[in-house]
């Protein structure tokens, strides 16, 4: 790539000496130059100049190539107008020369020497130039021309020139390529020709690319699965080791210590005895519940006394500890330990024993006998004390309902 300084110098040179057109064909805005003569040429003509060889024409790009200072000085020393005027001033110049003849001539050699001298800062003169004795190289002749008759030199020369032009055109075509692109040449690679098997090659390359991507993804998946399995295995082994340690500390070690100390059999026997006692207690309680259910009686921990004895004892204690001035009904109601309730199965009132909670259908008879026992006990107590008190007459059974406050 040309530097900014190079572009600036070339821009200044372009506007001078008819350098804005191609020296060979007159095309506008040329982008290539022949540094050897300081002339500006187009892309097509630059290809033809390359065919001449670098000893006759050294071609450079204005924008794409790097430049040296000596090359920029040659561009200042030369130019399109200067080269044309110099060629026309020479005696051996022929306007009908071909490209090969023109640049292999003595006039072109003199101008090349002049450009080099001016670029190097030397003075140049036609008389002192070493190009005065320039001899153009003989053009190549075809093998068929060797057998031509020497009496036809002009035709042989014309044929050789035509053959050289054909060879030059073929060489130019090799540089430009089959596409004929205007910008194909030095610094611009021509596009490759498409072949019939390009489609197959592209398909195979796509297949290979897809397979390589698949193998890459599979390898990544396998590596990720391996890492996951390794991590899971490490965690599982860690948990198993923790569980084994806990089992060893909490179960195996205590059992082993007890076996060593001889306490394991004591613990087993105590556990069995406790279990047997629990089973025995549950069995006895169940048998007692079944017996109670079928007998219809609730059994307490101790046998309850008879009803008459209970009433007698309660009445005796009451008469000994209570005032005799109270009426019979008030004394009976306050001192009676049993509660009077109505049986749900009959209309009779029964006296419930506090110890056993039994029901009796003969409640009125028991109540009557209890009253008689209480009266007799009261008389005996009074006689022992030596004090005579009037005993109220026994109230008939049927009159008891009128005195109760229901």
UniProtKB/Swiss-Prot annotation:
Q: Which SMART domains match?
A: ArfGap
Q: Which residues form the Arf-GAP domain?
A: 7-124
ZnF (C4-type) spans are 22-45
In terms of one coarse class, where is the protein primarily found? cytoplasm
Q: Which CDD domains match?
A: ArfGap_ArfGap1 (cd08830)
The answer to keyword Nucleus applying to this record is: no
Gene3D superfamilies (alphabetical): Arf GTPase activating protein
The highest taxon in the source lineage is Eukaryota
- Which biological process terms from the Gene Ontology are attached to this UniProt entry? protein transport; regulation of ARF protein signal transduction; regulation of endocytosis; vesicle-mediated transport
The modified positions for Phosphothreonine read 135, 189, 350
Cross-referenced InterPro entries: ARFGAP/RecO (IPR037278), ArfGAP_dom (IPR001164), ArfGAP_dom_sf (IPR038508)
Record's compositionally biased regions (Polar residues): 307-329, 343-354, 369-379
Q: Which GO terms describe its molecular function?
A: GTPase activator activity; zinc ion binding
* This protein's UniProt keywords: Acetylation, Cytoplasm, ER-Golgi transport, Golgi apparatus, GTPase activation, Metal-binding, Phosphoprotein, Protein transport, Transport, Zinc, Zinc-finger
Q: Which residues carry this modification: N6-acetyllysine?
A: 231
Decide whether keyword Hydrolase is in the record: no
Q: Name one Pfam family in it.
A: ArfGap
Q: Where, per the database record, does this protein carry Phosphoserine?
A: 150, 246, 304, 343, 346, 348, 361, 363, 378
Question: Residue ranges of region Disordered?
Answer: 297-406
Localization of this protein:
Cytoplasm; Golgi apparatus
Summary of subunit composition and partner proteins: Interacts with ARF1. Interacts with the COPI coat proteins, KDELR1 and TMED2. The interaction with TMED2 inhibits the GAP activity.
Domain remark from Swiss-Prot or TrEMBL? The region downstream of Arf-GAP domain is essential to GAP activity in vivo. This region may be required for its targeting to Golgi membranes.
Q: PANTHER family under this entry?
A: ADP-RIBOSYLATION FACTOR GTPASE-ACTIVATING PROTEIN 1
* Name this protein carries in UniProt: ADP-ribosylation factor GTPase-activating protein 1
Q: Which organism is it from?
A: Homo sapiens
